[in-house]
């Protein structure tokens, strides 16, 4: 178990300082996001010490102390170091969560929930009248999330392939692994006005001896369903561990998406076409029944 060198009151101050730094790094002025990061106890979602944090050059190193105050850093903590799965950068997630424009009462599906830390942040943001569906394919991570989120009545943990969820209309969908294409439910089960944030990414060709297969090219995108189609916008660079299950891709998709990233121009994308014939020459990337294009919806 983590140890505590600080009193509960002191730890509350440390959490507030951590949340303030996270929000500032993310360049978000949304006070609800900062409050959520100040409220949720991150240590509940990191597993038992000794914790490991990511090195800048790759791999992980163990922390020499098990003091829970060390959880309140803007660093990556390993969840499954052999697979390259980590707790994520708080400031990156704060930035992406700000793009979701979450409202009290929203129904949100969190795809790739891991041990549930960002599901708990979402739980704070939607409030008691909203609901978070935390979907995680790995049974060990899902079991940890189930335990860590048990005190949150507005969260349901689902051990399933995220490519099959949600199974009903959602106000927002938040994806936490790199994909080369959106899963059908992520597009078709967004309600009008619904928002999707996902990391588009191409798997690295080489897989490190320790750690999972991360994206070699990556970009976070915001998709919003309007009356006449799907608006799309580039948020920024984002490199996540790549999808397994129903969203694994073949060599042809890897080659085509890699070529698009190398050409550049994703920052000019304005729309996502879904099961619609794209205009040749007006798209950054054309996939199977979907495309990212330069024209407004």
Which stretches of residues belong to each language-model region?
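Conserved nucleotide-cofactor-binding alpha/beta core module
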Residues: 88-217, 224-226
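Short, intrinsically disordered/low-complexity patches at protein termini
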Residues: 58-59, 132-134, 255-258
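Residue-level detector of alpha-helical recognition elements and their boundaries
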Residues: 51-52, 111, 201, 250
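Class I SAM-dependent transferase core
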Residues: 2-109, 118-120, 125, 141-143, ...
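Poly-acidic low-complexity segments
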Residues: 41, 89, 138, 161, ...
